[in-house]
Amino acid sequence: MFYYLYDLYFNHLDSLRIFSYVTFRALMAGLTSMLVTFWFGHKIIDFLYGLKFRESVRDDGPKSHEIKKGTPTMGGLLIIGSLLISVLLWGNLKNPNVILLSVFSLSFSVLGFADDYMKSVKKIKGGMRARTKFILSILISFIFCILFFYYTGTTGQTGKISFQLTDLFFPFIKGPVIALGIIAIPFSILVIIGSSHAVNLTDGLDGLATGTVLISVMTLGVIAYFSGTPIVANYLNIPYLPGAHEYSVFLSALTGALFGFLWFNAHPAQVFMGDTGSLFLGATLGMIVILLKKEILLLILGAIFVSEALSVILQVGSFKLTGKRIFKMAPLHHHFELGGLKETKIVIRFWIIAVILAIISLSTLKIQ
């Protein structure tokens, strides 16, 4: 809004030119969303508690989780609300992808909310039917992938090499590696849904998903700024994507919202994000890496999410084939819990690993 007003009415005033700078708007977006989260945090928590939107724990889960029963859930409303307010104020609303990204995130948050509502209020065990949730996830992803490819265009530039936006890039390798062509759409849907459900599986300990997603979002914010700045993109020999630096404003707003939410979600958690938060956070990560041409990099940056999802796949597959379990419990963080590690130690160690993965991910921009 501020950028739009400046561009429309005040672009002749040098003193207000700062509102056109991406760096300033990104910093202010992060600060705004964090303050909004702090301000409304307790109010939203009390509101959720009053409506009996409360967490239930799995019957076969760790005994230490019994204390979490009754904690307000659907805290993702606080994250998505703070994010959208901040983007509305500081984002470039003339950039269609900023609008699309916001609506895309909101769509997955609504899907997660419906799932949480069925579990917490309607007391339907397991919430929304898995098939229904899966089909809706595919439908949302398909619609927005088509829209993003339409508004973003089809070609780009990396150094002296031209590329199609349907091409696939690999870390440590210059230029596009695989031309996906028409397969780009189903591949993108796979990335979004995989990321969404992987983050959802990671959300099992106080602050675990919040902190790890936060680190990934901050990293992608840096990459987005570099990708949208031609001098930096050409220097690093990464895909130059016009307008991509505006994603850094969106990601900064999301960073601030996550920092604010972590204040309430850290152990012992006063609120859980629920599927309302985890589904949209994972889906947003997936869409961002698609837009930045960093789909494969997500395997490094989001290795924690990948390992959590993989542990579930291996556990289920092993039990069906052999009748034996590989882990004490899946997802992976529960395996460590039952192994005797305290919840806070697991969370902090996962955060440390996430920081290391972020550093490695950023290093791939130059090491190629």
From Swiss-Prot:
Required cofactor(s): Mg(2+)
Keyword Isomerase set for record: no
EC number: 2.7.8.13
Metabolic or biological pathway, per its Swiss-Prot or TrEMBL entry: Cell wall biogenesis; peptidoglycan biosynthesis
Catalytic activity field: UDP-N-acetyl-alpha-D-muramoyl-L-alanyl-gamma-D-glutamyl-meso-2,6-diaminopimeloyl-D-alanyl-D-alanine + di-trans,octa-cis-undecaprenyl phosphate = di-trans,octa-cis-undecaprenyl diphospho-N-acetyl-alpha-D-muramoyl-L-alanyl-D-glutamyl-meso-2,6-diaminopimeloyl-D-alanyl-D-alanine + UMP
Membrane topology, record value: Multi-pass membrane protein
Keywords: Cell cycle, Cell division, Cell inner membrane, Cell membrane, Cell shape, Cell wall biogenesis/degradation, Magnesium, Membrane, Metal-binding, Peptidoglycan synthesis, Transferase, Transmembrane, Transmembrane helix
Domain of life: Bacteria
Transmembrane segments: 31-51, 73-93, 98-118, 134-154, 175-195, 213-233, 249-269, 271-291, 296-316, 345-365
GO molecular function, one term: phospho-N-acetylmuramoyl-pentapeptide-transferase activity
Protein name: Phospho-N-acetylmuramoyl-pentapeptide-transferase
Organism: Leptospira interrogans serogroup Icterohaemorrhagiae serovar Lai (strain 56601)
